């Protein structure tokens, strides 16, 4: 997956630097997923890179018969779980950091749990959130939407809920 992405970026470097939705010229499955997720969330395709790569890795595991597996790519998680699991959230300096976990029931298929932060990690952030976590069966979509919400989040702003209508994302 990473080699596919790197080869595409070598041919189309703008794909890697735009903060806006972008339609690639060609590219494979990972590139297509990133671009589609970015269009849905209104962000550039690289906002979905960690989720898309984790998803590709989990697909390989599931394709080999894994019924339980987790890939955590810097807070962007792809998982398949035949048992209940708990997923904690590290939110940097927030007083809520490492103090709670999401409890996920056993489930069929691959699921995405992606967290984006303005205070943890090297990503460019246009917002103020310590952690925004988004769940979706489309791992790239969860990653892109977590980034989009983090970028827009301002103290006291409650407009974001309207953006999720009809997207397949739960936040």
Identify the residue ranges that each predicted region occupies.
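Mature catalytic core of soluble alpha/beta enzymes
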Residues: 1-171
């Amino acid at each position: 997956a990473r080699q596919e992405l790197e080869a595409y970026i070598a041919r189309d470097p703008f794909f890697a630097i735009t903060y806006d939705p972008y339609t690639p010229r060609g590219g494979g499955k990972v590139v297509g997923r990133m671009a589609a997720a970015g269009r849905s969330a209104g962000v550039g395709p690289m906002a979905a890179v960690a989720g898309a790569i984790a998803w590709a890795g989990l697909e390989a595991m599931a394709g080999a018969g894994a019924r339980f597996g987790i890939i955590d790519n810097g807070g962007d998680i792809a998982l398949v779980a035949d048992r209940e699991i708990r997923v904690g959230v590290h939110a940097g300096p927030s007083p809520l950091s490492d103090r709670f976990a999401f409890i996920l029931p056993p489930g069929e298929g691959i699921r995405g749990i992606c967290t984006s932060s303005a205070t943890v990690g090297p990503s460019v952030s246009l917002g103020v959130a310590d952690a925004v976590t988004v769940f979706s069966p489309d791992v790239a979509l969860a990653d892109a939407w977590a980034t989009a919400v983090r970028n827009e989040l301002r103290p006291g702003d409650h407009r974001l809920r309207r953006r999720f209508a009809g997207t397949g994302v739960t936040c």
